[in-house]
Amino acid sequence: MEKTVELLEQAGFRVDLGKHVLDRHGYLAGRDEDRISDLNDAFVDSEVRAIIATRGGKGAYRIADALDFAAAHNDPKLVVGFSEITIIQLALWQHANIPSLHGTPSAFYDGLLSETTYRACLTALSSGEPLHLRSMEDVPTSSLTTSGRAEGILVGGNLDMIVTGADWLIPKLNGNILFIEDVKKAGLGHIDRQMTRLLKSGYLENIAGIAVGQFTNFDTTDGWSVVDVLRDRLALIDVPILGGLPLGHGRDALVIPIGTHAVIDADEGTLTVEAAVR
């Protein structure tokens, strides 16, 4: 965390730490009531312009419906994070109509993230210009790319959290572009179950398109990779799909807005997203 604070201060930001940022409660980073207190204190503080998660946010789904959505809407701040922080970001988009930033500059101490990610985060935090991303052949999900063009609000992030919040916290994604990424928590069957649940529940009805990022650390099982599982499930949805995006849990992952207008051009292999900075 010290390195993260140092880098942000070098970039010109003033950094304040939440009262409970170093807490522990079992496998969680503090008690639910303390974590939600830190978040809501930040939402009502007019000097705070962004809230940056220091890690992935285990258990964020326990507190996502307790956010002060009125305060967040009245004085929007960018929540920066990924993994389980996705459910916080989607709740803010749905209930306060504010965008967030998917990605983080804050894990330098364990070597997971790079200078590329850090610079991408600074750009997303400070620039009002659209962000342009290109599908990369060395990201295995690039083979999922189909054809066509789609536009709408880019919504999503970590697949596990999208499924966790579906229906009870986040409504259907009519007319929007779904973005998914994930990292291995269990076997391929877990991804199959997640995608099947979204399909069978009707959650993905009338979506405009799908953007697919990194699915990292998954093993091959009986000749199938995680990309094979995704291809099998996504084949049931007749919308443009753009894979191979450098977004997620992999090294050099970029940072993009969630909850702003986006365009995917599968033929050109590009994703363009309006800035979250207003």
Predicted regions mapped to residue ranges:
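ATP/NTP phosphate-donor binding region
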Residues: M1-E47
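N-terminal glycine-rich "phosphate-gripper" loop used for MgATP/nucleotide binding
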Residues: A50-Y61, F82
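Short Gly/Thr/Asp-enriched flexible loops that form oxyanion-binding sites at enzyme active sites
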Residues: G56-N74, L90-W93, S225-D228
